[in-house]
């Protein structure tokens, strides 16, 4: 539901490619849709109005740390793909959630072993996932702190405290919400110690204790990632007019190309969008060059 997408602006996601194809006479796939993921960190006082001011992108938002709502309650198995995690939080009161972790976060991130563009810990194979997907710098705890955590701490969007009680105050919980939050963390830590999430079924290796100071919390909402519909093309990646004939000399690939996603972005298939972009671009280039 894009109504609760907190971060909608991007200099790279303005639809120019699709517009240019339509101006040339191409046909747009029916049923527009977009993919929203859990990468927006929200400031105090954030409101879902027309402006939606103050949100920022936050790569660690996709880590499966403890999530609680504005009442301090855990409400989900946090080991979800991006849009499902966003949707779960968007359906909570005020349409966002808090993600909570402790001072052992780097060890926890290594244990989580997430893949794709949520990966923060260097991969043992030495692949491209060892680089931050946003600035291509080598991933490390120092980089995570310098590039992602410290600037948000300075901005006040990321909360940090020496005790859970103080953290709850920074999260603006009232007395009842604070008591619920502290009980939630205690319950969650018990599940971690037991090695089994009997509340929501999160796998044991994605459970992480919240017990070592300092403690952190971030208000997480949805960020617009990508359109998942686009221009209708033929097998050569040439856009089609409404009569089904191709527009010669024009090719549409990548996110501007339709007919690939059934109005759902399957983010549990790592690299699916990059893979289809490279594949259909190669097909288009070969056709343009007249080679088999």
Model-derived segments and spans:
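Short beta-alpha connecting loops at secondary-structure transitions
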Residues: 2-6, 48-53, 149-152, 264-273
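An anion/pyrophosphate-binding glycine-rich loop and adjacent beta-alpha core
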Residues: 18, 24-173
């Amino acid at each position: 539901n894009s109504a609760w997408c907190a971060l909608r602006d991007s200099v790279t996601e303005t639809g120019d490619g699709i517009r240019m194809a339509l101006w040339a006479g191409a046909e747009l796939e029916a049923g527009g849709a977009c993919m929203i993921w859990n990468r927006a960190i929200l400031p105090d006082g954030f409101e879902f109005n027309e402006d939606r001011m103050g949100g920022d992108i936050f790569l660690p938002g996709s880590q499966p740390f403890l999530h609680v709502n504005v009442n301090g309650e855990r409400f989900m198995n946090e080991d979800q793909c991006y849009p499902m995690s966003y949707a779960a939080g968007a359906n909570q009161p005020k349409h966002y959630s808090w993600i909570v972790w402790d001072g052992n976060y780097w060890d926890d991130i290594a244990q989580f072993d997430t893949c794709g563009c949520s990966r923060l810990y260097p991969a043992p194979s030495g692949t491209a996932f060892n680089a931050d997907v946003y600035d291509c710098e080598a991933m490390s705890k120092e980089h995570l702190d310098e590039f992602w955590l410290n600037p948000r701490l300075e901005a006040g969007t990321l909360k940090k405290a020496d005790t859970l009680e103080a953290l709850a105050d920074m999260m603006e919980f009232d007395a009842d919400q604070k008591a619920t939050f502290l009980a939630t963390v205690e319950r969650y830590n018990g599940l971690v110690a037991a090695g089994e999430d009997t509340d929501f079924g999160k796998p044991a290796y994605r459970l992480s204790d919240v017990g070592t100071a300092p403690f952190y919390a971030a208000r997480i909402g949805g960020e617009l990632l990508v359109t998942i519909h686009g221009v209708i093309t033929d097998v050569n990646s040439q856009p089609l007019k409404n009569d089904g004939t191709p527009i010669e000399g024009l090719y549409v690939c990548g996110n501007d190309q339709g007919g690939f996603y059934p109005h759902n972005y399957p983010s549990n298939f790592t690299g699916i969008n990059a893979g289809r972009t490279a594949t259909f671009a190669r097909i288009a280039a070969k056709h343009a060059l007249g080679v088999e």
